[in-house]
Amino acid sequence: MFSGKEITLFALSTLIALIVLNYMSATPNPVCLIELTGHSAVLRGNNCESLTSGVIEALSAHLHGLRN
């Protein structure tokens, strides 16, 4: 099964992710958020003008690599 360290690490990672998501939803988009869905990307927030298509493609490739 899983060791105590693995369970603790999973629980802490989940807690930190929930805290970050709560913080991001509480602030009114102070930064540019990229939502990658399928073959498209939606940019929301401020300072999105500085992002290039290469940056979005790199993020998409990184996430695709994490899924595999």
From Swiss-Prot:
Tagged with keyword NADP: no
Protein name as annotated: Movement protein TGBp3
Cytoplasmic side: 27-68
Organism: Papaya mosaic potexvirus (PMV)
Residue intervals annotated with topology Lumenal: 1-6
GO cellular-component term (any): membrane
Transmembrane segments: 7-26
Family annotation (InterPro entries): TGBp3 (IPR003411)
Record's miscellaneous remark: TGBp1, TGBp2 and TGBp3 seem to act together for cell-to-cell propagation. TGBp1 is the main movement protein that physically cross the plasmodesma with the viral genome. TGBp2 and TGBp3 would facilitate TGBp1 function.
Function: Plays a role in viral cell-to-cell propagation, by facilitating genome transport to neighboring plant cells through plasmosdesmata. May induce the formation of granular vesicles derived from the Endoplasmic reticulum, which align on actin filaments.
Family: Belongs to the Tymovirales TGBp3 protein family.
Entry's localization field: Host endoplasmic reticulum membrane
Gene Ontology BP term (one): transport of virus in host, cell to cell
Entry-linked Pfam families: TGBp3
Keywords associated with the record: Host endoplasmic reticulum, Host membrane, Membrane, Transmembrane, Transmembrane helix, Transport, Viral movement protein
Disulfide bonds: none
Primary localization class, coarse: host cell
Domain of life assignment: Viruses
